[in-house]
């Protein structure tokens, strides 16, 4: 696989980081990554990062409500935003000749969001609907319950979406204060990936955001030391679903130790990514205990979770969990076979390379890891480092992290008294 | 000028090679001119199950070996089956093209269809259907499609229903494969860099010589009108699409949020009004400044999710509108959405609104075609539809050529009397 392009890494005098990757293709993504996620919220303001993200495009600077949508879509641009535990990001992707429009909108949004009081009241209803929708979705319930139960305390226990009580209590004053504290040049990385020339792009960024000054004053001071886990713990919820959706999760350290993080990513692929992975073969193919199974690993600023996610017939859940633990134990007991290790490494390297195929994908990859680590090295070295992860390093992480005595299990199962969704015609 | 090399081999297979000089990713799509719509009425889901079994073992490889061979070079292979065609798709790095082609060929022409894999895959598909019904959108949309296309060849979901899949038999799978896995009914699209001569030589060496048989159950591969006639012969008059228009199916589930989907007929790709209707769909519900989003969500706060989409199908397309709303406002939301569709003809978009929709679509088009996989799928689809691989390349011109009065007339003709599926919380 070809190595990824070099990043043009710049910093404006006001502290704003600018990361540029020029590439052909006629498309450009302008993507602002802000270190503002649910991990930095107080319980009273739980959900404010995500609520604020919804408000960003509802008017900013010279753009009135609804105008950003019209302007961006009017030039064929696509905008979107996302919020998680550690970050908020918002981006515009457009044909490269519309780079000035994309930059102007993103600059307005990060410096001068209007947070219009009427829009805020209306958007709160939209978020409460999103909350309702999440309760209807077995995955939504599963992941929210997992993070709540797995952590006894710490930055990731609370939900990104917030809860109705906190959402009702967030008014304009609270949101504006949160915005001004976090949307500050030193806490923002601006990504420009696509068909642009870095010197000219940088000049445009300087013109748009050179006068942006605001101190970064995080609402909550954290060092990650406050994380404690509850495991071993098991929670089973009943819902109107046809299959069981379950997860088994284990504590993993924060993404500070790069070597450990690379090895954990390989472990994740070895165990549960791809049809030839250990869990897929043993649990789904050979023993037919799961109808789907995969592994994943959180690479985050603070200690997070490694998980095995599955769907199954409820009657098979106990055997499935037992068999999954046997596979996990095997990896902890003996280093992976060369063929299995090579498969995991190659698949992971290519998955990363393929994720960079779009401008959005590349800016998300660089932006995410920059926000977590404060540097571009982890992401740009990724493919080379993964190729060097040894069997011993993978085994070491399995021993260190995947301990049954620290495991959290959550399952969303069908209701006991036959509950298939009913159909009727009218 | 787009560099695509089209080859029709002596065995009848059509191969399209599209290099991407600045990228190392290789996407291949092998599309077989046969889809779920061709399943016998009492064997719904047969083609889908057959397609899924292609990667589950061949004469020389087990399911594990298929996965391991590709994954050990960081690639993958996946089967698909839609209403109009089925096939296989691979993704690898360009230097591994031989491995990808070898596995693809093996799966396409030499599947073993063992009893064990048949049994396993059948129950996995049933589980997938059950899970799809756990998702509000797929649950409601699946039922909408069945209602809208009732009596039509598209009247059953491609993967079948839990009950129809249960009754599928192993022997029918073998028979179907023998009938359709023939080079002359396959289009192979390759997006990425391969050495043309060597690639074609490898195919000539490993793919069956043909045409194997002239007729059989395979759909004729000729021009769209010829194929149309052939298909029409199989359609009874009452099988026109849209039999369920004007009707409503009400679904219940323990949910906090209601969901409504409206289905309208749409001109199929290639016909004169299809671009105008595509634009009507954009004005109505594509993007955050489209009517549905800006009015029903941003102005009236009736929804979290609302929008529209046009689903192209070879025989009969459809356009659908959807809204996720509070159960208390489900009737209002449904009426308002329906009125927005009907009002499009009476409240035509002005130049600015039309231009917004046009630009939005052109932007999405450009952004959506950034990956080799997306290009390969698009080329295979329009090639199978008989429109030629270039069809997708000319999307911008078609959209730019549509005038406001054409949008109005397309809306007047199509956007009335929808089929409706409503999901509401179950009582008690």
Annotate the PLM regions.
Chain B
Residues 10-12, 244:
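Glycine-centered tight beta-turn/hairpin loop motif at sheet-sheet or coil-to-beta transitions
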Residues 12, 19-70, 272-284, 292-294:
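Active/ligand-binding-proximal structured segments within catalytic/core domains
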Residues 13, 195, 288-289, 296:
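A generic "binding-loop/recognition-motif" signal
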């Amino acid at each position: 696989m070809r190595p990824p392009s070099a990043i043009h890494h710049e910093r404006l005098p006001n502290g704003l980081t600018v990361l540029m990757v020029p590439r052909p293709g006629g498309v450009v993504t302008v993507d602002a990554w802000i270190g503002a996620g649910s991990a930095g919220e107080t319980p009273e303001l739980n959900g404010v990062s995500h609520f604020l993200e919804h408000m960003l495009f509802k008017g900013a600077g010279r753009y009135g409500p609804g105008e950003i949508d019209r302007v961006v879509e009017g030039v064929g641009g696509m905008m979107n935003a996302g919020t998680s535990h550690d970050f908020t990001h918002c981006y515009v992707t457009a044909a490269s000749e519309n780079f000035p429009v994309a930059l102007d909108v993103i600059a307005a949004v990060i410096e001068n969001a209007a947070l219009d009081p009427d829009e805020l009241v209306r958007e709160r209803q939209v978020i409460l609907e999103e909350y309702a929708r999440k309760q209807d979705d077995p995955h939504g319930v599963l992941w929210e319950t997992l993070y709540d139960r797995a952590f006894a305390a710490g930055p990731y226990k609370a939900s990104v979406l917030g809860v109705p009580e906190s959402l009702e209590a967030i008014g304009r004053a609270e949101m504006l204060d949160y915005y001004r504290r976090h949307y500050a040049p030193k806490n923002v990385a601006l990504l420009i990936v696509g068909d642009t020339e870095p010197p000219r792009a940088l000049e445009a960024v300087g013109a748009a955001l050179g006068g942006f000054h605001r101190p970064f004053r995080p609402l909550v001071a954290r060092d990650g030391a406050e994380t404690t886990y509850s495991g071993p713990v098991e929670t089973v919820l009943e819902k109107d679903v046809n299959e069981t959706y379950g997860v088994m999760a284990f504590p993993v350290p924060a993404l500070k130790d790069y070597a450990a993080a690379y090895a954990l990513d390989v472990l994740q692929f070895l165990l549960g990514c791809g049809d030839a992975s250990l869990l897929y073969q043993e649990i789904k193919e050979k023993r037919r205990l799961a109808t789907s199974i995969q592994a994943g690993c959180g690479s985050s600023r603070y200690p997070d979770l490694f998980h095995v996610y599955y769907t199954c017939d409820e009657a098979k859940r106990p055997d499935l969990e037992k068999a999954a633990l046997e596979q996990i134990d095997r990896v902890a007991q003996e280093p992976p076979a060369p063929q299995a290790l090579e498969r995991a490494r190659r698949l992971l390297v290519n998955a990363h390379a393929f994720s960079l195929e779009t401008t959005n994908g590349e800016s998300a990859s660089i932006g995410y890891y920059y926000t977590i680590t404060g540097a571009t090295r982890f992401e740009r070295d990724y493919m080379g480092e993964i190729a060097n992860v040894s069997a011993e390093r993978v085994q070491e992480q399995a021993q260190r992290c995947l301990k049954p005595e620290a495991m959290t299990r959550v399952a969303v199962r069908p209701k006991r008294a036959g509950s298939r969704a009913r159909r009727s015609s009218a | 000028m787009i560099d695509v090399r089209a080859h029709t081999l002596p065995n009848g297979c059509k191969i399209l090679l599209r290099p991407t000089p600045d990228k190392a990713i290789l996407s291949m799509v092998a599309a077989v001119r046969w889809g779920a719509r061709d399943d016998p009425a009492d064997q719904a889901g047969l083609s889908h199950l057959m397609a899924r079994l292609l990667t589950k073992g061949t004469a020389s490889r087990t399911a594990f070996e298929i996965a391991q061979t590709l994954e050990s070079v960081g690639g993958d292979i996946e089967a698909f089956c839609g209403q109009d065609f089925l096939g296989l798709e691979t993704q690898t790095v360009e230097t591994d093209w031989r491995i990808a082609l070898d596995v693809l060929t093996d799966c396409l022409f030499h599947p073993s269809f063992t009893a064990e894999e048949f049994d396993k895959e059948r129950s996995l598909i049933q589980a997938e259907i059950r899970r799809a019904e756990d998702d509000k959108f797929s649950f409601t949309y699946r039922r909408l499609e069945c209602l809208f296309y009732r009596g039509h060849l598209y009247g059953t979901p491609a993967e079948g229903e839990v009950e129809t899949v249960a009754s599928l038999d192993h022997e029918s799978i073998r028979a179907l494969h023998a009938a359709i896995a023939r080079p002359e009914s396959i289009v192979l699209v390759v997006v990425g860099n391969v050495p043309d001569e060597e690639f074609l030589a490898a195919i000539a060496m490993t793919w069956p010589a043909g045409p194997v048989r002239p007729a059989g159950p395979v759909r004729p591969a000729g021009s769209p009108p010829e194929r149309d006639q052939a298909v029409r012969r199989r359609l009874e008059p009452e099988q026109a699409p849209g039999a369920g228009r004007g009707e409503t199916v009400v679904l219940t589930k323990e949910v906090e949020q209601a969901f409504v989907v409206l289905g309208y007929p749409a001109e199929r790709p290639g016909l004169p009004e299809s671009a105008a209707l595509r634009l009507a769909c954009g004005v109505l519900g594509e993007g955050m400044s489209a009517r549905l989003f800006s009015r029903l969500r941003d102005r009236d706060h009736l929804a979290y999710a609302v929008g529209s989409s046009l689903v192209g199908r070879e025989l009969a397309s459809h356009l659908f509108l959807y809204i996720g709303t509070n159960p208390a406002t489900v009737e209002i939301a449904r009426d308002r959405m329906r009125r927005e569709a009907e009002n499009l003809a009476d409240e035509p978009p002005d130049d600015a609104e039309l231009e917004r929709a046009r630009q939005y679509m052109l932007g999405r088009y450009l952004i959506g075609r950034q990956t080799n996989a997306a290009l390969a799928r698009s080329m295979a689809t329009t090639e199978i539809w008989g429109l030629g691989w270039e069809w997708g390349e000319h999307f911008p011109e078609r959209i730019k050529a549509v005038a406001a009065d054409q949008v109005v007339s397309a809306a007047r003709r199509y956007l009335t009397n929808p089929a409706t599926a409503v999901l509401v919380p179950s009582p008690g």
